[in-house]
Amino acid sequence: MGVGTLLNGLLVSVVAALLWKYSKLSEHAALLEEELHMTRRSQELSQAHIDYHVALQALQEHGTRMVCTGKMHTDRICRFDYLCYCSEAEEFVFFHSNSSVMLPNLGSRRFQPALLDLSSVEDHNTQYFNFLELPAATLRFLPKPVFVPDVALILNRFNPDNLMHVFHDDLLPAFYTMKQFLDLDEDARLVFMEGWDEGPHFHLYRLLSDKQPLLKEQLRNFGKLMCFTKSYIGLSKMTTWYQYGFVQPQGPKANILVSGNEIRHFAKVLMEKMNVTRAEGGQEDEYIVVFSRSSTRLILNQAELVMALAQEFQMRVVTVSLEEQSFASIVQVIGAASMLVSMHGAQLITALFLPPGAVVVELFPFAVNPDQYTPYRTLAALPGMDLHYISWRNTEEENTITHPDRPWEQGGIAHLEKEEQERIVASKDVPRHLCCRNPEWLFRIYQDTFVDIPSFLEALQAGLKAKPVWKKSKLSGGLHPGRVRDARCQTSVQTSSEAKLTVSWQMPWNLKYLKVREVKYEVWIQEQGENTYMPYILPQQNYTFSDNIKPFTTYLVWVRCIFNKNLLGPFADVLMCRT
């Protein structure tokens, strides 16, 4: 072989090696450029820094991880690491690797009916959440993900056009869900997945976080595959007090877990975020607020109503309107009012900003029974809200104006059969019904009303007679007693048919630090083997029982403390007493 041939072969090898290295460098450069691009896309979402390569490697190697609280889909909230969302499929994706965690691991039970509720409205079939599953290895076939570095709270707004729903279903639950998980702080990102646009009250959602909330429609702008590095999905339902009648007619929830203390704390925080201060005035500064509506459910003689209130109570009367004023300015006015008067409607949720001791007056159109529609009555009655509620109902049919030719959603009935229209018009009382399209309910609730001033003032004065005298109470007024201490029993047999049982105990430890108006003790005595027990309420810390106490018998005895007749403490450990 000649030297030239040898050199040519060597040159070809060197060139090939250089080309291969160049192609690898180009490939690596392209990969780095793509990662840089995806990092920029991620940082379009947030100012938080993210190492794209590290995040992608974590997703590929460890997959998605999920740990949830709650036993049922109706009370479950889940935390995810690296849960992704495919905007093309409009589905969340759980990527499985050998390091993935899924607790609870429900298998197909995850679809019976869902993993969790995306909103605080319980078990509504439009609010269910679930995800698709893929092996992490399929990431190589999918578009490069955009990572969201913020901690996200992902939820559905239930009805963002309605102020009552905004507060009751969304803001309060989201606020206290964020309190439940420490990393859902003011830097967290809210992500709304129900598909609505911003709506008229979007500024209120912005108060929950320093980050702009994201809408479902906006997610596709950031890429075909978005991955949330850390997210929480679902809302706490503990702050809700009302159910809307999807399964049974609407009314207060059966098991209300929130008090006025939590509602008032939430209201205080929102007022601070809106730069609203609560004015502290004396009696000379008292005034009444009347809510004015401009399109439906009108008070047709509003000026007369305002004048009557001013004359009756010798107070200034202020009118407010959601259509004409900013929400913050309305809250500023309501926050120091003595009384809030309004036709039934979502605007009455602003009663949660009223000061303690204020009065809520709710007006109802003809044929609408106040006892059947009670979200604001229930709010006012929550322990610690300290609001007094009064309702007035129009009972005079001639004082109402109906709108049968409006669209059905505003109470129109022209689309119904003539016989059904006649039945609805003739009805004097809307029967109990389910949500949400009952035509008789809509026809009546969207009426306009001339308020009969004499009957209105009569209802107001009767209601005010029942108003308790509100005093600024100290926190200890609502605190419960602890367990009684050192409970013990002694027995003695008097005769073959008579015995005595003496029970004694020490007061709860926390009682010595509290100012309590009344302290009593409850004792339960049960003969072993029997199903019934004898209850006793006692003012002292020891007592000798002889009635119905038999010799040579074992009794089970429980003791607890009661503050102010209704603040019950826990029972101490059961005593076993043998006579």
UniProtKB/Swiss-Prot annotation:
Gene Ontology molecular functions: acetylglucosaminyltransferase activity; protein O-acetylglucosaminyltransferase activity
Stretches that traverse the bilayer: 5-25
Signal peptide (UniProt feature, chain positions): none
Catalytic reactions on record: 3-O-(alpha-D-mannosyl)-L-threonyl-[protein] + UDP-N-acetyl-alpha-D-glucosamine = 3-O-(N-acetyl-beta-D-glucosaminyl-(1->4)-alpha-D-mannosyl)-L-threonyl-[protein] + UDP + H(+)
Biological process annotations from GO: neuron migration; protein O-linked glycosylation; protein O-linked mannosylation
Residue ranges that the UniProt entry lists as topological domain Lumenal: 26-579
Pfam family, one: Glyco_transf_61
PROSITE patterns the record matches: FN3
Fibronectin type-III domain boundaries: 480-579
Membrane topology, from the record: Single-pass type II membrane protein
EC number: 2.4.1.312
Record pathway: Protein modification; protein glycosylation
Glycan attachment points: N98, N275, N542
Subcellular location: Endoplasmic reticulum membrane
GO CC annotation, single: endoplasmic reticulum membrane
The organism's place on the tree of life at top rank: Eukaryota
Cited InterPro entries: FN3_dom, FN3_sf, Glyco_transf_61_cat, Glycosyltransferase_61, Ig-like_fold
Record key words, sorted: Endoplasmic reticulum, Glycoprotein, Glycosyltransferase, Membrane, Signal-anchor, Transferase, Transmembrane, Transmembrane helix
Enzyme class: transferase
Family: Belongs to the glycosyltransferase 61 family.
Function: O-linked mannose beta-1,4-N-acetylglucosaminyltransferase that transfers UDP-N-acetyl-D-glucosamine to the 4-position of the mannose to generate N-acetyl-D-glucosamine-beta-1,4-O-D-mannosylprotein. Involved in the biosynthesis of the phosphorylated O-mannosyl trisaccharide (N-acetylgalactosamine-beta-3-N-acetylglucosamine-beta-4-(phosphate-6-)mannose), a carbohydrate structure present in alpha-dystroglycan (DAG1), which is required for binding laminin G-like domain-containing extracellular proteins with high affinity.
Protein name: Protein O-linked-mannose beta-1,4-N-acetylglucosaminyltransferase 2
Organism: Tetraodon nigroviridis (Spotted green pufferfish)
